[in-house]
Swiss-Prot record:
Coiled coil: none annotated. CDD domains: neurotoxins_LC_scorpion (cd23106). Excitatory insect beta-toxins induce a spastic paralysis. They bind voltage-independently at site-4 of sodium channels (Nav) and shift the voltage of activation toward more negative potentials thereby affecting sodium channel activation and promoting spontaneous and repetitive firing. In vivo, this recombinant protein is lethal to Locusta migratoria larvae after injection, but has no significant effect when orally administered. Is not toxic to mice after intracerebroventricular injection. It is found in: Secreted. It holds the Pfam family Toxin_3. Belongs to the long (4 C-C) scorpion toxin superfamily. Sodium channel inhibitor family. Beta subfamily. GO terms for cellular component: extracellular region. It comes from Odontobuthus doriae (Yellow Iranian scorpion). The keyword Disulfide bond applies. It comes from the Eukaryota. This is Beta-insect excitatory toxin OdTx12. InterPro entries: LCN-type_CS_alpha_beta_dom (IPR044062), Scorpion_toxin-like_sf (IPR036574), Scorpion_toxinL/defensin (IPR002061). Residues 1-59 form the LCN-type CS-alpha/beta domain.
């Protein structure tokens, strides 16, 4: 499940970053497994309902 946005939009270079920073006021955002993945949200709300294994995969993929 993504926060708005369809899969093709996710693949655009700045789509997720814009979505995360402008809409959710996060520090930055990335596309991971065809959904936007936000880092550094200002409040503790979850933008994505995402499984632990998928979160680990996204963290690992984005950081490395």
């Amino acid at each position: 499940q993504s926060t708005g946005g369809k899969a093709p939009e996710c693949l655009l270079s700045n789509y997720c970053n814009n979505e995360c920073t402008k809409v959710h006021y996060a520090d930055k955002g990335y596309c991971c497994l065809l959904s936007c993945y936000c880092f550094g949200l200002s409040d503790d709300k979850k933008v994505l309902e995402i499984s632990d294994s998928r979160k680990k995969y996204c963290d690992y993929t984005i950081i490395n």
